[in-house]
Amino acid sequence: MISISVIAQKPQKLSSNQIYEKIQKLNFIGSALYIAAHPDDENTRLIAYLSNAIKARTGYLSLTRGDGGQNLIGPEIRELLGVIRTQELLAARNIDGGSQFFTRAND
């Protein structure tokens, strides 16, 4: 007897408000890509405005992950700092409604 288990990603359960917002975005044809060198260079206010008020498909391209920066509040440096800043950016995009993109450039 062979047993096979398949693990798949569960579909998101969206609230009625989230579904309504996604439908509203279908009525706008346009997109915006905000590009900056470091994770802390983004203008979250602009990204949120374009994504939520204008209903544009909005993204932020961070050329680096911020692993070359300074960390005044913790011991993380280099790659570990890049991991923290990456998670911060992903959390910010969940709040402001934009998409997050990265390049492979080193800081």
Regions found by a protein language model. Name each.
Residues 9-107:
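Active-site rim/loop-helix segments in enzyme catalytic domains that contact anionic ligands
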